[in-house]
C-alpha cells in the first residue's frame, strides 16, 4: 500500500541545490540505492523516507547557512536537516571574492541579531557569546534589543 503525501515545499537548501544543479555541466551522482534513487524531500532511499516524520519546530530564531559550492548537492548535508525543521532558514553559496547581495541584506535586516556559530577555543574571551538575552518561545516578545537571533553557520555541515 502506498501512502500519498502532500508535496514538500522547497526550503532554502533545496532551492540552493536546484540552482546549483542548473549550473552544473554534468550530473551529480551521490552514492545511493542501486540506481542512485533518493526521495526528493529527505534524500534517503525511498524505502527509508522520513518525510512523514518531519517535525515543525516553532522558534523565533533563524539560521543562515553559508555553504561551499557543492555542499547543497550532498545527501549528507546537515544544513538540509536544519532547513527541514527551522522555517526561517536562509542558504547562500559562499565565495571569498563575491558576496550575495541578499546575504548582505539579511545581515543588515533590523529584525535579526546575527551570531556566528564557531568554536570559541581560539577566540578572545570577550568575543565568546555564552547566552542570548531572548525570551523563549515563538510567541514571546522580542528580546531586550528587539531582535531575533540569526545563527550563522559556516558551510552548513
Predicted regions and their residues:
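Short Cys/His-rich Zn2+-coordinating modules
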Residues: 16-32
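Short cysteine-rich clusters marking metal-coordination/redox-active sites
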Residues: 39-42
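Short metal-coordination and nucleic-acid-contact micro-motifs, chiefly zinc-binding Cys/His arrays
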Residues: 35, 45, 59
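Histidine-anchored nucleotide/phosphate-binding helix
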Residues: 52, 73-85
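Short hydrophobic beta-strand segments
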Residues: 62-72, 113-118
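S-adenosyl-L-methionine/SAH cofactor-binding core of RNA-modifying enzymes
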Residues: 87-157
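Short Cys/His-rich "knuckle" micro-motifs
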Residues: 47-53
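Detector for small/aliphatic-rich hydrophobic stretches
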Residues: 2, 9-11
